[in-house]
Regions:
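Short, functionally critical alpha-helical segments immediately adjacent to catalytic or ligand/cofactor-binding
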Residues: 8-25, 58-63, 115
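Short alpha-helical patches at coil-to-helix transitions and adjacent helical residues
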Residues: 11-14, 30-31, 112, 151
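Short, conserved phosphate-binding/catalytic loop or strand-edge motifs used
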Residues: 20, 31-38
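Short capping/connector residues at structural and topological boundaries
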Residues: 29, 38-42, 95
Length: 169
């Protein structure tokens, strides 16, 4: 089943998010996730509690998947995969979209399905194409990265892609 049919999410929003987050999978592994989170725990007192929770979720995920927590690579903040999920969000909101019994942060079907599910669970409305500032779609995108600038950039990128696709026909 097509992701758009299951979740009623504008596919260009998904394309925009993975483009911004990892340049479509080309840039997702600059740091070891374990080290990123541990460094925040010991070096950044304001982020220590948050990073401790995320490290716990990272360890849950790596144990479940039977992989070393020291091999998973991601961002300086501890996000990983093509969608750059933080461990707690990945554990809670990722899905096995392709049906192989694995929630894989490096499988495009699972990644796009997981982002769509995440946005839906965070208020992305059905049958809605209002991409304006502070609309329900904008708000759901903002939960993915708690920044007005991020949500605006995703929507601007989506609009630019849409314009270029339309102009090419």
């Amino acid at each position: 089943m097509c992701i758009r049919d299951r979740f009623d999410i504008d596919p260009l929003i998904l394309v925009s998010i993975v483009g911004i987050e990892t340049n479509y999978g080309k840039r997702y592994s600059e740091y070891t996730v374990f080290n990123s989170l541990y460094t925040q725990i010991v070096s950044l007192p304001k982020r220590s509690s948050w990073a401790t929770k995320e490290l716990y979720h990272l360890l849950l995920y790596t144990k479940e998947q039977n992989i070393s927590p020291f091999l998973l690579e991601g961002s300086y903040a501890g996000a990983f995969g093509y969608g750059q999920f933080i461990p707690s969000s990945f554990n809670k909101l990722s899905i096995d979209y392709n049906g192989d019994n694995k929630k894989d942060p490096y499988n495009w079907e699972d990644v796009l399905g997981s982002i769509a599910y995440y946005l839906t669970e965070n208020g992305y409305p059905e049958n809605n194409h209002n991409f304006t500032f502070r609309s329900p779609i904008w708000r759901s995108i903002r939960t993915y990265n708690r920044s007005d600038k991020y949500a605006n950039t995703v929507i601007d990128f989506r609009n630019e892609i849409s314009k270029r696709i339309f102009l090419s026909y």
